[in-house]
Amino acid sequence: MPFVLFIIGRARGYYMAPAYPVLFAAGAVWGERWVASLSSRRALVIRRTTWIALAIGALVDAAIVLPIAPPGSSWWRFADKARGGDFNEEIGWPELVQTIASIRDSLPVQERSRLGILAAGSGQAGAINLYGPALGLPKAICGMNSHWLRGYGDPPPETVIVVGMTRDFAQSAFESCQIAGHVSNRFGIENSTIRNTDIFVCHSLRQPWPRFWQGFQYYG
């Protein structure tokens, strides 16, 4: 029943992945008994047909699931659409973090010591937390989902690199903001890495951090 509900709700297939072996095993028991009831000739045809279908299915799945299509190609776009847009979200994250690191390096030394990186979404925050340590970046500050529970650090940052936010948000949240860079990817593929492409360096949060943080929690 959960499997049927997931199909009806068009949920992501891998959420049910731990249940697939159980479902396959249950089907295999029934299938084995059914094939055993057939004549040897029919059983042989069924077995060969099954193996051929599995081989074709494996090739099709590999073409769609594995990252082997050239990014931006027709094949890639078809696979991306079949996967619900997951492929395009794999593009550009290292470049994003490298751009943030370059902006950090351009700041005065005294500003780097109390630096924070405010990310709009869990994608940006995850990329910063994954690739950032090798570049000496601090952990991302993010209000989305469970990232909000991790807070903004102690002591709170004084200089903030704002990623993925609109200019209106940056200017309303901070007293001073300047565009310091832009987000892009070498394939020109539009995804959440290049949504709100400006990266800002901001100073002087207009509210105390605890008050700002209480109103900054959101879900997505």
What spans do the regions from the language model cover?
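Hydrophobic/aromatic-rich transmembrane helices and adjacent perimembrane loops
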Residues: 4-48
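Short, well-ordered secondary-structure micro-motifs within conserved domains or adaptor modules
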Residues: 154-166
